[in-house]
Amino acid sequence: MQHSHFDAIVIGSGPGGEGAAMGLVKQGKRVAVIERYDQVGGGCTHWGTIPSKALRHAVSRIIEFNQNPLYSDQSRLINSSFSQILRQASTVISQQTKMRQGFYERNHCTMYSGEAAFIDDHRISVRYPDGTCDILSADNFIIATGSRPYCPPDVDFSHSRIYNSDTILDLEHEPRHVIIYGAGVIGCEYASIFRGLRVKVDLINTRDHLLSFLDQEMSDALSYHFWNNGIVIRHNEEYDTIEGVDDGVIVHLKSGKKVKADCLLYANGRTGNTDTLGLENVGIKTDSRGQVAVNAHYQTSCEHIYAVGDVIGYPSLASAAYDQGRIAALALTTGTSETHLIEDIPTGIYTIPEISSVGKTEQQLTAMKIPYEVGRSQFKHLARAQIAGMNVGSLKILFHRETKQILGIHCFGERAAEIIHIGQAIMEQKGEGNTIEYFVNTTFNYPTMAEAYRVAALNGLNRLF
């Protein structure tokens, strides 16, 4: 049994853990990173963001090819299965893992591949797969253990046709019909992927409309696009029982309806990976979903233990987790941090087409009684979109009628998650630098998707009187 002491120990090597570890070593700290699996990267790299987005990219390219008259008129349609595309996506995972492993090696982080659990305030055990154990100690700790799909106890996830958003990546059979329970971000993204592969999709939503945190217009656009592509959305429904049968799954809904399909993807919530950490030994409590409460500097109730990423809940974004880790590292080393997450964090939803937003929605601005105006552009009117055959989509800019300050930007369409950053950069400018007039006073490359900003700005400014 090995006993080692470090300035700081980071538990987890996903985006939050990586940001924390890199921030600490840059401050000259001796750092250990404990990862429960044999490869770094966390759920983001191996089961979440990277594989699902690689899948989505492949499916969207197949759709693009099949809808292009140059190819479809010649009966050259591509028909690829979920498992075939997933095998191709695995190459991206290996590239990401190798790159991130290099970060830790070059920065001289000491790596441990095992299960971490607190013994007391300054000691932690690392249990390895072979049953052996090391005891490590540190002055400070950063918990970045991430989250996993919430699996209710009354659903039999051992059944061969019932999956969660992690195990769906092990899908080997080719379903013709899938039920997705939960119409949040993950559910909607997988609905797009399966429908893009011509699989029938029943999307069961426990709420009254899709992705209620979005601007209503974006939510409605996604709902219409799903409907137009044959996805059946069942709003305001909850399961009574989920029954696995020999040839598939039957979902018995509380409304009395029944839905049957070849398989089911349960995608209704996530829970923090805290149950095996021994947090009771250091006096840290979690909520019903295993999440840890922190202050503005990401300190837990135990002042030398910090937590970042999905394990603390909102916003549960890989991009935010990395920044949280970096900020926590700075607070840990200096005692405080002047750096905070930006107020308006962009969200990217990788449905087909994408959705991305930053800032306020129309609903929020109306409730706040802020006098705003709207500028819109339709992708179908942009030369670049016409050239690329990506006519579905729109950009909406919300701005203050009097000051012209940009208050929110909402985009639906191909490359939305990239396009949003142009507007975000202007929104983050101080004082008079944040103005919608920037887009009419600046010359953009032509033809580009960035032209959407100029069109939307002119549209909005023309509404003023």
Swiss-Prot record:
<dbReference type="InterPro" id="IPR036188">
    <property type="entry name" value="FAD/NAD-bd_sf"/>
</dbReference>
<dbReference type="GO" id="GO:0004148">
    <property type="term" value="F:dihydrolipoyl dehydrogenase (NADH) activity"/>
</dbReference>
<dbReference type="GO" id="GO:0005829">
    <property type="term" value="C:cytosol"/>
</dbReference>
<dbReference type="GO" id="GO:0006103">
    <property type="term" value="P:2-oxoglutarate metabolic process"/>
</dbReference>
<keyword id="KW-0521">NADP</keyword>
<dbReference type="GO" id="GO:0003957">
    <property type="term" value="F:NAD(P)+ transhydrogenase (Si-specific) activity"/>
</dbReference>
<dbReference type="InterPro" id="IPR022962">
    <property type="entry name" value="STH_gammaproteobact"/>
</dbReference>
<dbReference type="Pfam" id="PF02852">
    <property type="entry name" value="Pyr_redox_dim"/>
</dbReference>
<dbReference type="InterPro" id="IPR004099">
    <property type="entry name" value="Pyr_nucl-diS_OxRdtase_dimer"/>
</dbReference>
<dbReference type="InterPro" id="IPR016156">
    <property type="entry name" value="FAD/NAD-linked_Rdtase_dimer_sf"/>
</dbReference>
<keyword id="KW-0274">FAD</keyword>
<dbReference type="InterPro" id="IPR001100">
    <property type="entry name" value="Pyr_nuc-diS_OxRdtase"/>
</dbReference>
<comment type="function">
    <text>Conversion of NADPH, generated by peripheral catabolic pathways, to NADH, which can enter the respiratory chain for energy generation.</text>
</comment>
<keyword id="KW-0520">NAD</keyword>
<feature type="binding site">
    <location>
        <begin position="35"/>
        <end position="44"/>
    </location>
    <ligand>
        <name>FAD</name>
    </ligand>
</feature>
<dbReference type="InterPro" id="IPR023753">
    <property type="entry name" value="FAD/NAD-binding_dom"/>
</dbReference>
<dbReference type="GO" id="GO:0050660">
    <property type="term" value="F:flavin adenine dinucleotide binding"/>
</dbReference>
<keyword id="KW-0285">Flavoprotein</keyword>
<dbReference type="Pfam" id="PF07992">
    <property type="entry name" value="Pyr_redox_2"/>
</dbReference>
<keyword id="KW-0560">Oxidoreductase</keyword>
<dbReference type="GO" id="GO:0006739">
    <property type="term" value="P:NADP metabolic process"/>
</dbReference>
<comment type="similarity">
    <text>Belongs to the class-I pyridine nucleotide-disulfide oxidoreductase family.</text>
</comment>
<dbReference type="InterPro" id="IPR050151">
    <property type="entry name" value="Class-I_Pyr_Nuc-Dis_Oxidored"/>
</dbReference>
<protein>
    <recommendedName>
        <fullName>Soluble pyridine nucleotide transhydrogenase</fullName>
        <ecNumber>1.6.1.1</ecNumber>
    </recommendedName>
</protein>
<keyword id="KW-0963">Cytoplasm</keyword>
